[in-house]
């Protein structure tokens, strides 16, 4: 059996990952890039990259195809466009980028370190009303909040 982290590490060499500072420059040079935030809607609503499209990971594959209730036409039509995937820490986007490649997306990238890294680099985020998010608020939001009961038990 493999853990999620092991699976992500195994497929990472097969995808393109981009650090936030490189993504900032890339987006300036490629304004046609579709930014897809694959976090859950409540995460996206709290803060996200301006002009990004929210397609939660759980419906991503359906959103990439016609004839589903989850279909996102802009995403379906983006197979030849640059697509930058974002999540909280870059793990979900590793799997998502791999899947999109299998589905025929020609230029899909994963934001390495995710929005946590984006925020650490002090790149702009906006809220649900597209208003700028204060960097300190973003730092607090992206701080690790793993509860004790969520941690792996110590080995006996």
Over which residues does each language-model region extend?
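Rhodanese-like catalytic fold shared by cysteine-dependent sulfurtransferases
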Residues: 1-33, 41-82, 91-156
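Active-site flanking residues adjacent to catalytic metal/cofactor-binding acidic residues
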Residues: 36
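Short, surface-exposed ligand- or partner-binding patches at beta-edge/loop junctions that are enriched
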Residues: 86
């Amino acid at each position: 059996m493999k853990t999620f982290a092991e699976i992500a590490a195994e497929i990472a060499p097969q995808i393109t990952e981009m650090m936030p500072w490189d993504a900032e420059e890339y987006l300036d040079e490629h304004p046609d890039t579709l930014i897809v935030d694959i976090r859950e809607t409540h995460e996206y609503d709290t803060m996200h990259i301006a002009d990004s499209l929210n397609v939660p990971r759980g419906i991503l594959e359906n959103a990439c195809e016609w004839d589903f209730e989850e279909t996102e036409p802009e995403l379906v039509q983006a197979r030849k466009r640059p697509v930058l995937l974002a999540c909280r820490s870059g793990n979900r986007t590793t799997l998502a980028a791999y899947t999109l490649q299998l589905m025929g997306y020609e230029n899909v990238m994963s934001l390495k370190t995710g929005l946590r890294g984006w925020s650490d680099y002090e790149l702009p985020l906006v809220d649900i009303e597209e208003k700028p998010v204060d960097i300190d608020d973003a730092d607090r939001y992206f701080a690790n909040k793993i509860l004790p009961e969520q941690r792996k038990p110590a080995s006996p």
